[in-house]
Amino acid sequence: HYLHRRQRQMCIRDRISPFRSTAFQPGSDDFITVDSEDLKGKWNVFFFYPADFTYVCPTELEDLADNYNDFQKMGVDIYGISTDSHFCHKAWYDSSEAIGKIQYPLISDNTFSISRSFEVLREEEGRAERGTFVIDPDAVIKVMEITCEGVGRDAEALLQKVKAAQYVRDNPDEVCPAKWKEGEATLAPSLDLVGKI
């Protein structure tokens, strides 16, 4: 019913809710525990995807893997998240050439709690939407993007958004215009600029 009242939706500038879950850590072939405390003091990307052993998802995760070193150079940790189990994540890693490239943890959200707290859970299916969240060192959401099932995401575009978010955090009196790239001019909002752009 359209009059049903919802709780307030998650928004930019919201602090993320505490969480704790098991993840598969590629490379070490080990299962690790990841919780909200691990995020503090650094930049993070939460990359929700619908399911392991699918079609668009491995292309996205491989694209992130291909750009992983660039994210790491910027001090950004990446977490892939789906509602599959950590065992399923490992089986996918062991059997897929594309997924075999990744170095970042794949979090299991098989209780749906993380997907639900980020409001990307498709309750009727028990799967997450394609949701991307850039989280700053204070555990505050700075960028969020949700795309439909058939639309894959671009890691290079995400990298640019993270660079802009980091720049604005470090330079709070400046803003990054459209198509801004690192090293290019920014804007300093003032009355002098009104109507002149």
Indicate residue ranges for each PLM-predicted region.
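Short loop/turn microsegments at loop-to-beta-strand junctions
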Residues: 17, 43-45, 129-131
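A short beta-strand-turn-helix
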Residues: 20-44
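Conserved helix-turn-beta segment immediately C-terminal to the redox Cys motif
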Residues: 52, 59-81, 96-97
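Thiol-/selenol-based redox modules, centered on thioredoxin-like
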Residues: 128-197
